[in-house]
Curated annotation (Swiss-Prot):
Its cofactor is a divalent metal cation. It is found in: Cytoplasm. The keyword Metal-binding applies. Its EC number is 3.1.3.5. Nucleotidase that shows phosphatase activity on nucleoside 5'-monophosphates. GO terms for cellular component: cytoplasm. It is an enzyme of class 3 (hydrolase). Its main location: cytoplasm. This is 5'-nucleotidase SurE. NCBIfam families: PRK00346.1-4, surE. It catalyses: a ribonucleoside 5'-phosphate + H2O = a ribonucleoside + phosphate. PANTHER family: 5'-NUCLEOTIDASE SURE, 5'_3'-NUCLEOTIDASE SURE. GO terms for molecular function: 3'-nucleotidase activity; 5'-nucleotidase activity; exopolyphosphatase activity; metal ion binding; nucleotide binding.
Length: 255
C-alpha cells in the first residue's frame, strides 16, 4: 500500500513525524509531501496565482511552498508519478480539529483533497491543554492511530467521505475508548479581534481567542463531548455539504 502523508503545520512539525510513524505501521511505501511553512487555518486554499516551489528535503520527503491542498495534488499527480497513492493521511495536527474547526483546518482540507481525488483519506489531530501545549500526548496518537486507520480501511471508506480522527489530551492508558461522533458546535464568543499599534502608530490586528469566555458545554454524541471525556473521536465527514433536509422546503419556497 502506497501512503501519501501531509499536514498543515509544516515540513518540520513534530506531528508530521508522528503521522509518518503511523503510516509506517501500515506500509513501507510512505511518502511525505508537506508545506514549507506553517499553513494552519488556510482551509482548502488552492494556489492559483503563485507558482509552487518544490524542495526535496530527504528520501521520499518533499516540501512545497504552498497549502496542504497543493501538497496533496503535487504528491498524487506529480511526485509519486504514475503509481498513485492508495491512502492519504493528513496530520498529526497539533491541536484538535472538531466542531467549526473543520471549516478552517488545513489538516482537514488535506484529507478532503485526497477524497476529491478518489483516495481513502484520514485527518488526524492531537488535542492539547494549556498545560500540555508544549508537549502534546503524541503517544496517544501513535497507539490508536494505526489500528483505527487499519480497521476503517478494512471495512471500506465510502466515496466522498473523509474520516476525521481526534485524540484526547491524555496519556494512552487514560483513554477510555474509541467512539464514532458527529460534528459538534462550540461557543464562538471566544473569538476576538486584537488591535495593536506598530512602531509608527499604525494599527494592525490579530484574530485572537478570549480565554475568559464561557467554556463549551458540548452535546452528547459530539466530537467535543468525546474528547472532554477522554475518548478518541472518529467522525465521518461528507464532501457533499448539501442540506437535504431543507432542500424540499426550499423548493416549495422558490416554486
Amino acid at each position: 500500500m502506497r501512503i501519501l502523508c501531509t499536514n498543515d503545520d509544516g515540513i518540520h512539525a513534530p506531528g508530521l513525524k508522528v503521522i509518518e510513524e503511523i503510516a509506517r505501521a501500515l506500509s513501507d511505501d510512505v511518502w511525505i509531501v508537506a508545506p514549507e511553512l506553517d499553513q494552519s487555518g488556510v482551509s482548502h486554499s488552492l494556489s492559483l496565482n503563485d507558482p509552487l516551489r518544490l524542495r526535496e528535503v530527504g528520501p521520499r520527503h518533499f516540501a512545497v511552498r504552498g497549502t496542504p491542498t497543493d501538497c496533496v495534488i503535487m504528491g498524487a499527480r506529480h511526485i509519486l508519478g504514475e503509481k498513485r497513492p492508495d491512502l492519504v493521511l493528513s496530520g498529526v495536527n497539533k491541536g484538535r480539529n472538531v466542531a467549526e474547526d473543520v471549516v478552517y483546518s488545513g489538516t482537514i482540507a488535506g484529507a478532503l483533497e485526497g477524497t476529491i481525488l478518489g483516495l481513502p483519506s484520514f485527518a488526524l489531530s492531537q488535542e492539547f491543554s494549556i498545560a500540555t501545549r508544549d508537549k502534546p500526548s503524541w503517544d496517544t496518537a501513535l497507539k490508536f492511530g494505526p489500528q483505527i486507520v487499519r480497521k476503517v480501511l478494512d471495512a471500506g471508506v465510502p466515496k466522498n467521505t473523509v474520516i476525521n480522527v481526534n485524540f484526547p489530551s491524555c496519556a494512552p492508558d487514560q483513554v477510555k475508548g474509541i467512539v464514532v461522533t458527529r460534528q459538534g458546535k462550540r461557543n464562538l464568543g471566544f473569538l476576538k479581534v486584537d488591535e495593536r499599534r506598530d512602531g509608527r502608530g499604525n494599527p494592525y490586528f490579530w484574530i485572537g481567542f478570549d480565554r475568559a469566555a464561557a467554556l463549551d458545554v458540548p452535546e452528547e454524541g459530539t466530537d467535543l463531548a468525546a474528547l472532554a471525556a477522554h475518548y478518541v473521536s472518529v467522525t465521518p465527514l461528507r464532501l457533499d455539504r448539501t442540506d437535504e433536509a431543507f432542500s424540499g422546503k426550499l423548493g416549495s419556497i422558490l416554486a
